[in-house]
């Protein structure tokens, strides 16, 4: 392979790495837990990370227990799990 071809390949690999989303290995483990409203009967807007869709979604949190995949704002969810 010519040096020009190697440089092109190296450039493409570098670009691909930069455009690839964050690996699931880089996310906290709790980002992969399903949303859990908990047993209480509150009605609080919350957000959780959906690993298949690779985005944060809204759900209604009951106000107690649940799991750590539970954020008060979508920005907090994105910073923690989708960044």
Curated annotation (Swiss-Prot):
The record marks 41-42 as: Reactive bond for trypsin. Its main location: secreted. Coiled coil: none annotated. InterPro entries: Kunitz_BPTI, Kunitz_BPTI_sf, Prtase_inh_Kunz-CS, TFPI/VKTCI-like. Disulfide bonds join 31-81, 40-64, 56-77. Residues 31-81 form the BPTI/Kunitz inhibitor domain. Residues 1-24 form the signal peptide. SUPFAM superfamilies: BPTI-like (SSF57362). Keywords: Disulfide bond, Protease inhibitor, Secreted, Serine protease inhibitor, Signal, Toxin. It is found in: Secreted. CDD domains: Kunitz_textilinin-like. Pfam families: Kunitz_BPTI. It comes from the Eukaryota. GO terms for cellular component: extracellular space. Expressed by the venom gland. GO terms for molecular function: serine-type endopeptidase inhibitor activity; toxin activity. Belongs to the venom Kunitz-type family. Serine protease inhibitor. This is Kunitz-type serine protease inhibitor mulgin-5.
């Amino acid at each position: 392979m010519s040096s020009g071809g190697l440089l092109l390949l190296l450039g493409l690999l570098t670009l691909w790495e930069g455009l690839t989303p964050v690996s699931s290995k880089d996310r906290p483990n709790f980002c992969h837990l399903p949303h859990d409203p908990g047993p209480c009967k509150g009605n609080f807007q919350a957000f959780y990370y959906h690993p298949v869709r690779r985005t944060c979604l809204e759900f209604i949190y009951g106000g107690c227990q649940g799991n750590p995949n539970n954020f008060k704002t979508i920005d907090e969810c994105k910073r923690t799990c989708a960044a």
